[in-house]
């Protein structure tokens, strides 16, 4: 339940715990903290037009791009569907 089978990212199950910990750390350390919620636009159209296998491949590629471009101390979650 903690790792998304399709994208191999953390699932939203861990988001509250990790986010709370990072907010506490940033507050105590006096360092900035950034969070993004990203939704893939028109994703239903992709699934409807090219099929779910293509949609799954796009989700894997998007997840990989996010994961590979986040600092080593950062986290990437698949919140659900096409939201990261």
What are these regions (language model features)?
Residues 11-34, 44-67, 77-81:
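Conserved long alpha-helical elements within nucleotide-processing catalytic cores of c-di-GMP signaling
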Residues 1-10, 24:
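Amphipathic HAMP/coiled-coil signal-transducing linker helices
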Residues 6-7, 40-42, 50, 84:
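Hydrophobic/aromatic micro-motifs used in signal-transmission helices and low-complexity FG repeats
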């Amino acid at each position: 339940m903690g790792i998304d089978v399709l994208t191999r990212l953390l699932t939203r199950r861990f988001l509250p715990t990790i986010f709370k910990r990072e907010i506490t750390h940033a507050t105590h350390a006096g360092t900035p903290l950034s969070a993004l919620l990203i939704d893939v636009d028109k994703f239903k159209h992709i699934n409807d037009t090219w099929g779910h296998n293509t949609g799954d491949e796009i989700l894997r590629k998007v997840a990989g791009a996010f994961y590979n471009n986040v600092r080593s101390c950062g986290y990437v979650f698949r919140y659900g569907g096409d939201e990261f």
